[in-house]
């Protein structure tokens, strides 16, 4: 375990190694497993245990896809089988339900058809694991799959291309047509739907398609002549078609060359369906039809009728008069017996087979009726092929000794198949030469082979083993194929055997088959498979509508000062702001009112007065109580009101005499509220309650008579509201109030009536349009603001007063296509999405769902989920699952997961899961294991013995480090794009005191190679880490990323991270007090929360001091007077031309100095270069300082010292430093305006007490506002330059030279890409007003390059 290399060779076959490897695979994590395998055994990928299992078998069984992929890269043999059951890794991953591992194996070429010792392939295991409720029946909705050579367009795919495996006939699936029977012929095909409709395609010569013409149809087309009949069975041959309806009528069409249509007089052809006259059937009901090339067969329970060319297959003798054809249906006399009841009939070109209910099988051929077998009870299907006809009957179409041998197949209810062949003349049971047992549910027969469908939905193709005596040369080929056959199948066929031996071959892409058919020649095939959604029960559900609740909320939240209402009603002393569109749609009265502006109405109780506080129309409504008008509005908005609610207790409204109505607007109405405390009553309600007491005493004298008479509704609020509803044209409300009574001061709904619900239309009331939506493609939609705001919070926020869209007169541009925007608006108005429900375009519905998800229209999103589930197919299931996972469509995702789980075999065989991401594949695996109940018991218990890997970490294996550093060539570019995208999603924000910075600050400041770094941090960031860092506070510069170091600003600002040491300053600035620094009884001078610092990967001193100072300062900079500003400007001009200090030296980009050095140099440069543009920083003095000192005072150069002095200086501490003081070394880099970057080496003392007492106020550097400036801080003492800093500088210059030589091409390309993006962003090309140049910053000093001579 601890050895660096394994103790074996590449040919290791150690059984102990194998056991240890398998033990670790079962109990370790993926990282531990890979680390162990890389160190433990050279042959860990292929070593096997005693059962033949390797690491790949166990990894796929445990679902550890990462280990499996790693083993595949190491060359593990994926096709190796274990010794116990012959399972491959694919068998095991399927058995344990790890679909992600299955897909990984399939991508590396593992076959799905490899069989184990029991003859089961991985597809068979999937079929065996199918849930028990999934059963395929012929009554299920079925889809048609066809394949073959397609010579005559008989497959219906719209082209003449051949199909090598079953393909869906999507015409029926798109139109929702389910087919229950398919008949394939040489020149055409007939399809019978479950609804009784007939479709045909192929060559139409002679009218065999029944469309009224002889045109060729490439795809199935409905036979219009039979659309009014419910057809139950179809039969067809080479030139004609026979159709049987539910009522026993028979229709035929096509060529009538042999009088097989049964039409009198016989035409040459018939291109539309025509009925066979019932008089020839003696009033009996036809229950079945069959057809051959030369004849047609009809049968009832009692008799069989044939017609057509009599070549011996009709069951009739030769006509003595020489008539070759039977024109009308004629009963077969040999089967005319009282004990014969016909159950099944089949026909071929030269033979007819009949089966009776007693189990007798009759063959009509050679002008005879032969009994082939007896007592074959419970037969479900019979088929016949071949046959020979008398060529003298029609020498033009028949040849002497023509035809094929007769073969008859019969299947009983138990799934047994019996075969009768003319070469053996005996009925034999078929036995299958297949490694496992199959149960047959349907059969089809052609001249060369048999097709089968099993009860499990599988499809097979079978062929007979040829006779040994005639095909002895093929014996060598036959014997290997029977090697894995069941024990009851002998390898050598014998004509005297009681079984007919059939060799089976599985059909691909047949997993839900219920029926199969073939043409007589065996060139084209069709198979009916159950609809893949048949067993799906996870169907999305649309939540209940909140349409009325949203409008009710709009009514409740509307006030006179909002920007949404456009009309106000004054009723009594109350004002009701409302929306014209809703009132106009609900009432013709209000529509006329708004059209006429209240000037030409006959009703004088409503008139326009003036404008309300928001400038909207104000209407006065008289002789209506405010409560009644409130109920009225409530009904118009929500389609209901309180007086329609059973059990509601309304307030009693009493009307006084008419002469009392001339006073105030409310003087004629009094209300008694017996259900509210006096403290909750308004003054008006108390007044009405006092007046009601007197009225109640007057009515005590005749309480009974008060309930009768003319004024019965005067004190009933229900009747009063009904009267008001009629007055305002709300007949719907009036009719619904008919079934409402007020009993015992409560509402009693006697008869609940439902009227026309609230229906809104975008096209109604066009004169009230107040907002216009404009789509991306330029189409405009006029809408009503109140509907948009009520239905969607997005529009409510957009159209509020605080946004420009609310006051803009221009159309609102929506980033949505017009088709999608129309669906959104229709939903907002009608609460329905008819277009979505009827749409077959999955992409369009997905686009609507995306927009609905963005706009948070949950119910429309659910409608889209339902529509997508209805259109779920095997082709789009994986795509929709990935789509649902991406847009958080939970119900759609669940439906897709179950759909894929139910059809896992078909989707894996079709390779349809390649669009799924790894996360979705993992979710699919989890769901699949939960869906199969047996998966709970299929768990591999981790092996207890074996090596202990509990202490093993990821770093233990060298292979991981190599994998991580070996990036793809385009990886850096990909990460740069991701970082750019993330930066767009997170825009920078800046406030006066947040300390942030804008994009212009980043672009104008020069890129720096050095980083502020704590003493603890020595890590180097890779290029992907730099490019994917947060966009706030960091950006990718142009220098090499190898010299970038991980920043850690928290070390200088959080005392809990640096224990026992004083906090290091950044740029000589004391850090702010954190919450731990402030005592509980002292009031902090800062705000409640300390500012958060933004980490940066590339910060120069000028820029960093600016934003760091801003981030540290919780208050705004002080405002100084004009004199101070003038003095400051004078000092700048005075010292601007001063010579630079001797300490100024050029420093290269990328030099790595310690944090102390950088701080020290930066502070010194502030003092020396104050007149230049390289640094202008003003520090506020501590509160204890009596007056500010001049920060621009000239700095005295340090005295010259010897080498010994430098050594002694480093050994002894600097005088004047306390125990908590530190020497700060700062590396400063100038701005882009300076021609060269300076280096200053100095040592500074921190000011004692600054950190513990208060937080200094730091202004933003180089503020454009001259009125905002800060006081000047005193300059700290200068520290001597150490020898170590000189050595460090030389080392960094050498490192800079190496970096410049080894700069990777990928980084250079990133820089060039960034330069081009900046040029485009600042519109540098063709700009006559500005000259914009973007170039790399100078690298700075490098070490002198040395070229060594080699080979001397």
From Swiss-Prot:
Positions carrying Phosphoserine: 991, 1005, 1031, 1034, 1040, 1046, 1055, 1084, 1111, 1113, 1116
Superkingdom: Eukaryota
ANK repeat positions: 51-80, 85-114
Biased composition (Basic residues): 701-710, 977-989
Region (Disordered): 692-716, 976-1002, 1032-1094
Matching InterPro entries: Ankyrin_rpt, Ankyrin_rpt-contain_sf, BTB/POZ_dom, RCC1/BLIP-II, Reg_chr_condens, Signaling_Regulatory_Domain, SKP1/BTB/POZ_sf
Entries under CDD domains matching the protein: BACK_IBtk (cd18500), BTB1_POZ_IBtk (cd18301), BTB2_POZ_IBtk (cd18302)
Segment forming the signal sequence: none
Comp. bias intervals (Polar residues): 993-1002, 1084-1094
Molecular function GO terms recorded: protein kinase binding; protein tyrosine kinase inhibitor activity
Membrane topology, from the record: Peripheral membrane protein
Ranges where the BTB domain occurs: 565-645, 769-837
Keywords on record: ANK repeat, Cytoplasm, Membrane, Phosphoprotein, Repeat
An annotated GO cellular component: nucleoplasm
RCC1 repeat residues: 141-194, 195-246, 248-301
Plastid in keyword set: no
Assembly behavior: Interacts with the PH domain of BTK.
Name recorded for this polypeptide: Inhibitor of Bruton tyrosine kinase
């Amino acid at each position: 375990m601890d050895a660096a290399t394994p103790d074996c060779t590449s040919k290791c076959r150690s059984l102990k190694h194998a056991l240890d490897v398998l033990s670790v695979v079962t109990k370790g994590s993926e990282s531990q497993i890979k680390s162990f395998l890389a160190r433990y055994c050279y042959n860990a990928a292929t070593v096997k245990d005693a059962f033949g299992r390797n690491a790949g078998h166990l990894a796929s069984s445990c679902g550890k896809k990462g280990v499996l992929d790693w083993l595949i890269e190491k060359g593990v043999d994926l096709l190796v089988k274990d010794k116990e059951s012959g399972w491959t890794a694919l068998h095991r991953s399927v058995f344990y339900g790890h679909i992600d591992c299955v897909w990984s194996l399939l991508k590396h070429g593992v076959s799905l058809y490899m069989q184990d010792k029991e003859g089961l392939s991985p597809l068979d295991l999937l079929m065996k694991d199918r849930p028990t409720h999934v059963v395929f029946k012929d009554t299920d909705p079925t889809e048609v799959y066809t394949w073959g050579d397609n010579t005559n367009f008989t497959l219906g795919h719209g082209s003449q291309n051949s199909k090598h495996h079953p393909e869906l006939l999507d015409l029926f699936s798109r139109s929702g047509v389910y087919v229950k029977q398919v008949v394939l012929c040489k020149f055409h095909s007939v399809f019978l739907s479950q609804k009784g409709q007939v479709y045909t395609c192929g060559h139409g010569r002679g009218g065999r398609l029944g469309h009224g013409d002889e045109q060729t149809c490439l795809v199935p087309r409905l036979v219009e002549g039979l659309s009014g009949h419910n057809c139950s069975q179809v039969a067809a041959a080479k030139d004609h078609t026979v159709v049987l309806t539910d009522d026993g009528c028979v229709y035929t069409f096509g060529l009538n060359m042999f009088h097989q249509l049964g039409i009198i007089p016989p035409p040459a052809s018939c291109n539309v369906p025509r009925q066979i006259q019932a008089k020839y059937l003696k009033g009996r009901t036809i229950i079945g039809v069959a057809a051959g090339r030369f004849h047609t067969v009809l049968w009832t329970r009692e008799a069989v009728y044939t017609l057509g060319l009599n070549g011996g297959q009709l069951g009739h003798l030769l006509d003595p008069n020489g008539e070759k054809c039977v024109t009308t249906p004629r009963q077969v006399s040999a089967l005319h017996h009282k004990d014969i009841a016909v159950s099944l009939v089949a026909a071929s070109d030269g033979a007819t087979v009949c089966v009776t209910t007693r189990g007798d099988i009759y063959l009509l051929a050679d002008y005879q009726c032969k009994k082939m077998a007896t007592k074959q009870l419970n037969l479900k299907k019979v088929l016949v092929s071949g046959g020979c006809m008398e060529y003298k009957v029609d020498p033009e179409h028949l040849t002497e000794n023509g035809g094929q041998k007769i073969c008859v197949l019969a299947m009983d209810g138990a799934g047994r198949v019996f075969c009768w062949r003319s070469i053996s003349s005996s009925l034999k049971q078929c036995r299958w030469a297949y490694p496992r047992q199959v149960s047959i549910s349907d059969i089809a027969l052609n001249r060369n082979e048999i097709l089968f469908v099993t009860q499990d939905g599988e499809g097979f193709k079978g062929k007979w083993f040829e006779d040994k005596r005639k095909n002895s040369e093929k014996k060598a080929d036959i014997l290997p194929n029977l090697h894995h056959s069941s024990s009851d199948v002998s390898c050598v066929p014998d004509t005297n055997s009681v079984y007919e031996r059939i060799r089976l071959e599985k059909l691909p892409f047949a997993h839900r088959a219920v029926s199969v058919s073939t043409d007589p020649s065996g060139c084209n095939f069709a198979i009916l498979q159950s609809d893949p959604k048949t067993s799906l029960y996870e169907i999305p559900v649309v939540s209940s509508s909140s349409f009325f609740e949203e409008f009710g909320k709009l009514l409740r939240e509307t006030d006179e000062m909002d920007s949404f209402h456009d009309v106000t009603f004054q009723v009594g002393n109350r004002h009701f702001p409302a929306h014209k569109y809703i009132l106009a749609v609900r009432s013709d009265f209000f529509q006329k009112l708004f059209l006429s502006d209240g000037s030409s109405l006959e009703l004088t109780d409503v008139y326009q007065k003036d404008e309300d506080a928001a400038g909207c129309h104000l209407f006065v409504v008289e002789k209506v109580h405010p409560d009644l008008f409130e109920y009225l509005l409530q009904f118009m908005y929500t389609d209901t009101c309180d007086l329609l609610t059973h059990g509601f207790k309304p307030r009693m409204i009493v009307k006084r005499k008419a002469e009392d109505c001339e006073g105030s607007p409310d003087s004629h109405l009094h209300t008694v509220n017996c259900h509210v405390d006096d403290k909750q009553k308004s003054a008006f309600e108390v007044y009405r309650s006092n007046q009601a007491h007197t009225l109640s005493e007057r009515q005590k004298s005749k309480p009974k008579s008060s309930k009768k008479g003319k004024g019965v509704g005067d004190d009933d609020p229900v009747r009063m509201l009904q009267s008001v509803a009629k007055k305002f044209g709300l007949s719907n409300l009036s009719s619904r109030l008919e079934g409402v009574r007020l009993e015992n001061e409560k509402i009693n709904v006697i008869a609940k009536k439902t009227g026309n619900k609230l229906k809104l239309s975008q096209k109604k009331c066009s004169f009230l349009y107040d907002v216009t939506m404009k789509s991306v493609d330029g189409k405009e939609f006029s809408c009503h603001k109140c509907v948009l705001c009520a239905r969607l919070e997005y529009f409510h926020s957009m159209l509020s007063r605080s946004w420009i869209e609310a006051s803009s007169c221009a159309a609102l541009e929506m980033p949505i296509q017009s088709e999608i925007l129309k669906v959104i608006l229709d939903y907002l108005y009608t609460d329905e999405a008819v277009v979505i429900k009827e749409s077959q375009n999955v992409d369009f519905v997905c686009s609507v769902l995306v927009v609905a998800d963005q706009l948070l229209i949950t119910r429309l999103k659910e409608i889209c989920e339902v529509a997508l589930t209805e259109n779920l197919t095997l082709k789009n299931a994986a795509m929709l699952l990935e789509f649902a996972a991406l847009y958080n469509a939970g119900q759609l995702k669940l439906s897709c997961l179950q759909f894929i789980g139910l059809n896992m075999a078909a989707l894996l065989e079709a390779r349809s899961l390649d669009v799924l991401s790894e996360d979705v594949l993992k979710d699919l695996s989890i769901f699949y294991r939960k869906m199969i109940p047996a998966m709970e018991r299929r768990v591999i218990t981790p092996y207890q013995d074996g090596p202990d890997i509990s202490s093993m970490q990821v770093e233990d294996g060298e292979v991981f480090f190599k994998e991580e550093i070996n990036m793809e060539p385009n990886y850096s570019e990909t990460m740069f794009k991701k970082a750019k995208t993330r930066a767009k999603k997170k825009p920078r924000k800046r406030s006066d005191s947040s300390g942030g910075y804008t994009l212009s600050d980043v672009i104008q400041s020069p890129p720096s190679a050095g980083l502020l770094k704590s003493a603890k941090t020595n890590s180097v960031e890779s290029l992907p880490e730099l490019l994917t860092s947060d966009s706030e506070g960091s950006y990718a510069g142009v220098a090499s990323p190898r010299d970038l170091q991980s920043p850690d600003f928290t070390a200088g600002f959080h005392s809990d991270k640096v224990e026992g040491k004083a906090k290091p300053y950044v740029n000589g600035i004391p850090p702010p007090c954190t919450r731990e620094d402030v005592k509980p009884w002292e009031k902090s001078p800062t705000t409640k929360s300390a500012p958060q610092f933004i980490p940066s990967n590339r910060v120069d001193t000028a820029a960093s001091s600016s934003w760091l100072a801003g981030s540290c300062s919780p208050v705004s900079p002080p405002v100084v007077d004009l004199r101070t500003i003038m003095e400051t400007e004078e000092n700048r001009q005075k010292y601007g031309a001063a010579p630079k200090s001797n300490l100024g030296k050029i420093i290269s980009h990328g030099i790595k100095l310690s944090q102390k050095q950088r701080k020290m140099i930066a502070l010194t440069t502030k003092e020396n270069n104050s007149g230049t543009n390289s640094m202008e920083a003003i520090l506020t003095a501590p509160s204890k300082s009596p007056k500010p000192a001049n920060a621009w005072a000239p700095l005295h150069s340090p005295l010259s010292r010897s080498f010994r002095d430098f050594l002694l200086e480093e050994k002894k501490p600097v005088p004047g430093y306390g125990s908590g003081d530190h020497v700060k070394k700062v590396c400063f880099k100038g701005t882009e305006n300076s021609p060269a970057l300076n280096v200053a080496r100095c040592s500074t003392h921190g000011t004692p007490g600054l950190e513990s007492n208060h937080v200094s106020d730091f202004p933003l550097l180089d503020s454009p506002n001259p009125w905002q400036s800060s006081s000047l801080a005193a300059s700290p003492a200068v520290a001597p330059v150490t020898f170590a800093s000189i050595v460090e500088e030389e080392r960094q210059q050498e490192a800079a030279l190496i970096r410049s030589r080894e700069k990777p091409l990928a980084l250079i390309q990133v820089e060039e890409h960034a330069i081009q993006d900046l040029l485009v962003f600042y519109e540098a090309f063709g700009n006559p007003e500005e000259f914009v140049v973007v170039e790399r910053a100078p690298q700075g000093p490098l070490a002198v390059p040395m070229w060594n001579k080699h080979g001397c």
